[in-house]
A protein has these predicted regions:
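Alpha-helix-loop-beta-strand connector modules within alpha/beta enzyme cores
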Residues: 41-60, 112-122, 173
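Short catalytic-loop micro-motif centered on adjacent basic/acidic residues
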Residues: 28-34, 125-129, 151-152, 226-228, ...
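A short, structured active-site edge motif that brings together acidic residues
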Residues: 54-66, 92-95
Length: 374
């Protein structure tokens, strides 16, 4: 849940009312992470106060990007147990894996043996990973270990980006449950919809809200195991539970799919690059993640500039092999394979100019020097 703040601290009393209500309504999966300020502590305190730890599943994440030794793994894990006031974690994730190199680093630190030990002791019940990257990397990580579950960003606008539909189906085919994050793209598929998209929703005979269209599109798919939603009000909580409990797999009609496509069309009307994310331009000999760069560039204009730049930094900064757009040398190899005939070199230059602000450039430079992944 997304806890409401009172000043600089979480409003623990309000959060408690929301969590207790959620449990009463049947919600049993609570997602948090080490780097969410105050979140683990608040959740642990509330569960302890109400003696309801046994009723729910806690999912939290190892900040793998901060770890440089096996001792570091134990340090963060033990601190999380203390924060959450529990002796075990139901669903433990390697947080924000972006490429196979991040997993290989953890393997070299002995993570596989560590996981085996924690599972045998009952301190971890399920092991997984949360992913931010492209489909190719998702498939590599998916097949690199015997995962119990995984977590991906997925919504009707990200169907063909990040892990995407291909990644979702691949996990399902392997029998790996998939947890969905960002079903509303951080609320943007509700709050930042173009006027014409809102009109399409309001005129639909279904009578669904913008959020309901997004959730129903997800719940319609058999490959989706669980959908996360950042809720900070009782009203939002009740609405989301109602939608989840009233949606069936394969319940979408042709008209429903048509409505989603019309909404997407209006959102895409403001895109800067007609990239479909097919990946035929890859691999770039210099390592530039071309589809991801264009996706973030488009996001600046279909949503807002801050979110596009934030995602760009997230996707480029924490990789062992730096892959930001500034590495393009203009060789043109990518353009020979683009089915959309995009002038990739020209568009990468445009994207770099808007995505790489002086502040982002400074942070990327610092990360290259510090190399926290080593």
């Amino acid at each position: 849940m997304r806890f409401t703040k009172k000043g600089n601290k979480i409003d623990i009393d309000k959060a408690e009312r929301e969590i207790v209500e959620a449990i009463d309504l049947g919600v049993n999966y609570f997602d948090t992470a080490y780097i969410y300020p105050g979140n683990e502590v608040a959740l642990g305190e509330i569960l302890s106060r109400n003696n309801c730890r046994h009723k729910i599943n806690i999912a939290t994440k190892l900040p793998q990007y901060l770890i440089k030794s096996k001792k570091g793994i134990d340090k963060y894990f033990n601190e999380q147990l203390s924060r959450l006031k529990t002796t075990y974690i139901d669903y433990y994730l390697m947080h924000m894996l972006t490429d196979i190199a991040a997993w290989e680093k953890l393997k070299n630190l002995g993570i596989e043996e560590w996981i085996k030990e924690k599972k045998e002791k009952g301190e971890i019940r399920n092991i997984g990973f949360s992913f931010h990257g492209n489909t190719e990397m998702f498939l590599k990580i998916l097949n690199a270990y015997d995962w119990d579950f995984c977590q991906i960003q997925y919504n009707y606008m990200d169907e063909n980006s990040q892990a995407g539909k291909i990644g979702l189906k691949a996990a399902y085919d392997k029998g790996i449950p998939v947890i969905i994050m960002e079903p509303l793209r951080g609320g943007k598929l509700v709050d930042l919809l173009p006027h014409k998209a809102k009109e399409i929703i309001s005129k639909s005979p279904r009578g669904y809200s913008a959020a309901e269209w997004s959730f129903r599109w997800l719940y319609n798919q058999k490959e989706v195991s669980c959908v996360l939603s950042g809720m900070n009000s009782i009203e939002m909580l009740r609405e989301n539970v109602k939608i989840a409990s009233s949606t069936q797999i394969d319940s979408f009609t042709e008209e429903d799919y048509k409505t989603i496509e019309e909404i997407k069309s209006e959102i895409n009307a403001n895109i800067k690059v007609g990239c479909t994310g097919c990946g035929y331009c890859m691999p770039c000999p210099m390592g530039v993640d071309i589809p991801a760069t264009f996706r973030c560039y488009n996001e600046m204009y279909t949503e807002n500039k801050k979110s596009g730049r934030k995602e760009y930094f997230q996707l480029t900064a924490f990789k062992k092999d730096i892959n930001d757009a500034s590495r393009c040398i203009g060789c043109g190899k990518c353009e020979k394979h683009c089915p959309q005939h995009i002038k990739i070199r020209e568009k990468l230059k445009e994207a770099r100019g808007e995505l790489q602000t002086p502040w982002i450039k400074l942070q990327l430079k610092a990360l290259r020097i510090l190399k926290p992944w080593q």
